[in-house]
Amino acid sequence: MAKILIGTSGFSYNEWKDRFYPIHLPQSDFLSFYCQEFNAVELNFSYYRMPTLSQCRQMVEKSGHRVEFVIKAFKGLTHEITDQSIPEILPQFKESITPFSQRNTLCAVLVQFPQSFRYTPSSRVYLQSLIKGLSPMPVCVEFRQREWLKDSVYATLKELNAGFVCVDEPSLRDLLPPVAVATSDIGYIRFHGRNRSKWYAGDSKERYDYLYSEDELTAWLPKIYTLAEQTEKVFVFFNNHKNAQAITNARMMTNLLNK
């Protein structure tokens, strides 16, 4: 049975003060505090801006090697793809996150494509080039477009030893259903919430404004155990970060798995 690690998508939210972090805790100490409770964290700041070596070194040091890191790929590799994405941006991104791999704390790079990334010949070629370019770093791929749910895609990911990211998100046209698929030795699940009304209409905070019930999380347990039987490690991350709901649900899932 694989090791199951639970955490949140991002940790540096000021609105979590007095909900998770002590009210007077400086933001520079958030990661150290987070690591006292959780054993994995998904870093998402790297999507919005290219990480720096010093940032990554500081995070490794502040973690005290108590958590396993997943770092989200920079948007220039997934959402704002150009002719320079592979030859220029990719090497820069790989170099910037070397402190994690040097300290053996980097478990995967999360490559999350937008809904506009369609299942086309050019997209398939790009996907393979990106995964190969990130090697030897482990890669896990999240699609937001249902077109990619194909056995041929799973086979390609297996061939490239890249993980498939399972998701829980609103039941809307073109989004992915809650399937449990393993294509590498890493199982991966992201809980985005089920806020149908705000998924397209709201901003990023409103989109992920959702608190899972215990019954909704319990329904995932068989899928988590299935992934654990097929992999060496399973990550479960909560992205419903508004008002620290991700913390509430991460704790809830931890308790359910420990029963």
Q: Model-predicted segments: where are they?
A:
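Residues lining hydrophobic/aromatic ligand-binding pockets adjacent to catalytic sites
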Residues: 1-259
